[in-house]
Amino acid sequence: MVDNTQWFKRCVGSWSSQRRYIYGNSSEPDNITTYFSMTQTADDSFCLAWGSDRNSGEMNFVIDGDVVHRDIGYYSSAPTDSQMETIDEDTIVFHTTYGGITYREEIRLLLDDNVRLRQTIGTRNGKVNVVGQYYEVREDVSD
């Protein structure tokens, strides 16, 4: 079994994120810059805090084998579990369902763990609800 906690440890630090979203049938992309930081709070626990000109928040989560237990979801204030799929040592895919939408989120670490390429697709009843593309750059490393 892969120790998924190690992948999250590689993400600890402060990041800037250039994000592009397309919702439903909209042809207009929504671009946003978000800043986030990840800290390790225990051997298998982490905290993700984010902020932008539109919103801010904090999510705490625990790694349990190939499951992530989050205290909130990205689009929900309720606790959420995600199934993790390890593609290779640099890439993890999260599979999550809540609010009637199924999400597939892939994150790949690049350039000595200083860049993250991320993409998300959310579907409902076989139709695309949201697509997100993210270019994330490490700003500094937390201890």
Language-model region placement:
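N-terminal helix-cap/turn-to-beta initiation motif at the start of protein domains
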Residues: M1-S14
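Short, solvent-exposed loop/hinge segments that bridge or flank secondary-structure elements
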Residues: N4-T5, S17-C47, N129-G132, E139-V141
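A short, Trp-centered hydrophobic/proline-enriched beta-strand micro-motif
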Residues: G13-R19, R116-R118
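Central antiparallel beta-sheet cores of small beta-barrel/beta-sandwich binding domains
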Residues: N25-Y103
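Hydrophobic core segments of beta-strands in well-ordered, beta-rich domains
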Residues: C47-A49, L117-T120
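Intrinsically disordered, low-complexity linker/loop segments enriched in Gly/Pro
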Residues: E89, D112-R116, R124
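Acidic and generally charged, gly/proline-rich low-complexity regions
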Residues: H95, I101-I107, D113, L117
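Edge beta-strand at a domain terminus
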Residues: R108-L109, Q119-D143
